[in-house]
Amino acid sequence: MERPTSNWSAGSWVLALCLAWLWTCPASASLQPPTSAVLVKQGTCEVIAAHRCCNRNRIEERSQTVKCSCLSGQVAGTTRAKPSCVDASIVLQKWWCQMEPCLLGEECKVLPDLSGWSCSSGHKVKTTKVTR
């Protein structure tokens, strides 16, 4: 059962999008020339587009398109609600909270099915689900 979410942090959506991109791209993609005019400094990520939508249940959904250039052994992730490069083992083993995806003062909990994490502070809960 999915929890209602509100005020999703931009970084939470970034991770989901980056991971979906990472898992669907061929391993040789890093050897191909860049197809976009956006150049990103190695070891960093940059937001190149942002989207926001609300549905009938007053749940705000946010997503971002991010371009990352991670170092060897790193993949796109989220740190302090912002896109970042994180150790690949965190993502492979689904230890989401080890990349510190929540803002300071928020509590991170891995979802029971390991499909993502939630960040909570008071009565506010932001849930991020990673999809392939």
From Swiss-Prot:
Induction data: By ischemia. Up-regulated in the microglia in the middle cerebral artery occlusion (MCAO), expression reduced back to control level at 14 days after MCAO.
Tissue: Highly expressed in brain, in regions such as the hippocampus, the habenular, thalamic nuclei and hypophysial pars tuberalis. Expression levels in the hypophysial pars tuberalis vary between day and night: they are low at mid-day and high at mid-night. The expression in the other regions do not display a day/night difference.
Keyword list, A-Z: Secreted, Signal
Secreted as UniProt keyword: yes
Signal peptide interval: 1-29
Keyword Secreted set for record: yes
GO CC term (a single one): extracellular space
Subcellular location: Secreted
GO biological process terms, semicolon-separated: negative regulation of microglial cell activation; positive regulation of microglial cell activation
Record-linked PANTHER family: CHEMOKINE-LIKE PROTEIN TAFA FAMILY MEMBER, CHEMOKINE-LIKE PROTEIN TAFA-3
Physiological role: Plays a role in the regulation of microglia polarization.
Family membership: Belongs to the TAFA family.
Protein name, UniProt field: Chemokine-like protein TAFA-3
Designated gene of the protein: Tafa3
